[in-house]
From Swiss-Prot:
Inhibits the expression or activity of extracellular murein hydrolases by interacting, possibly with LrgA, with the holin-like protein CidA. The LrgAB and CidA proteins may affect the proton motive force of the membrane. May be involved in programmed cell death (PCD), possibly triggering PCD in response to antibiotics and environmental stresses. This is Antiholin-like protein LrgB. The chain crosses the membrane at residues 5-25, 32-54, 64-81, 94-116, 143-165, 178-197, 207-229. Belongs to the CidB/LrgB family. LrgB subfamily. Its main location: membrane. The keyword Calcium does not apply. It comes from Bacillus cereus (strain ATCC 14579 / DSM 31 / CCUG 7414 / JCM 2152 / NBRC 15305 / NCIMB 9373 / NCTC 2599 / NRRL B-3711). It is found in: Cell membrane. Pfam families: LrgB. One of its GO terms (cellular component) is plasma membrane.
């Protein structure tokens, strides 16, 4: 079957699954479990399983969609441009907050994975979950992780932030728009930015820069943990 499969198969499956997710999210008035990315992932898994298709057959076209993830992150520069004055004024506080948050995320995942006895491949797959998909997947592959698990971890993490991010900020009385945006972007990448956009331009801009910096920090920090994994 693999020899007769065309790239359009993976593309069509992805678009239909995402379209269904978008409709469910709209008609459920934003219910977090119907976030389009999460729904598309679940429907894709079910379709491949029921149809007895292999991941390789799907990924012939799926990887073509993945190719556009990296250039798509350029869109994060738009809200940043609008808030460049605040970025210049608070650059040190912004950078230090994101770096500390990124490192803490990797450390927590590492400790929890060790504590519950996850095997090396699964642990390696979980470590990059703080980064956006375009960055997390290459990191996972480079350290021997399983991209499918990494993708699930990234999306699940983002869904949690999308659903509960505003509640956490309110609970811990985080009121400054810069702090809100940094927290959302550092913890929830693209969906964190979506929440930031709903809150305001400053939150959106700070969330956007957090997504970018978290990716860079994750690339640098994760190799430091590799000697301890085994």
């Amino acid at each position: 079957m693999a020899s007769t499969m065309t790239p359009y198969f993976g593309i069509v499956v992805s678009l239909i699954a995402y379209g269904i997710g978008t409709l469910l999210f709209k008609h459920s008035k934003g219910f977090f479990l119907f976030t389009p990315l999460f729904v598309a992932m679940v429907l894709g898994i079910v379709f491949l399983k029921v149809g007895n298709f292999t991941f390789e057959e799907y990924n012939t076209g799926g990887k073509m969609i993945s190719f556009f993830l990296e250039p798509a992150t350029i869109a994060f520069a738009i809200p940043l441009y609008k808030q460049v004055d605040k970025l210049k004024k608070y650059w040190w506080q912004i950078l230090s907050a994101i770096v500390v948050g990124s490192i803490c995320s990797v450390i927590v995942v590492f400790i929890v994975a060790k504590a519950i006895g996850l095997d090396t491949a699964v642990m390696n797959s979980m470590l990059p979950q703080a980064a956006t998909t375009a960055i997390a997947l290459p990191i996972s592959e480079s350290i021997g992780g399983i991209p499918a698990i990494t993708s699930f971890a990234v999306i699940f993490n983002a869904v949690i932030v999308y659903a509960l991010g505003a509640l956490f900020l309110k609970t811990f009385r985080v009121k400054h728009p810069i702090a809100k945006g940094l927290a959302l972007g550092t913890a929830g990448h693209a969906l964190g930015v979506a929440v930031g956009i709903e809150m305001g331009e400053v939150e959106a801009a700070m969330a956007s820069i957090a997504v970018t910096v978290v990716g860079v920090v994750t690339v640098v920090v994760i190799p430091m943990f590799m000697p301890f994994i085994g």
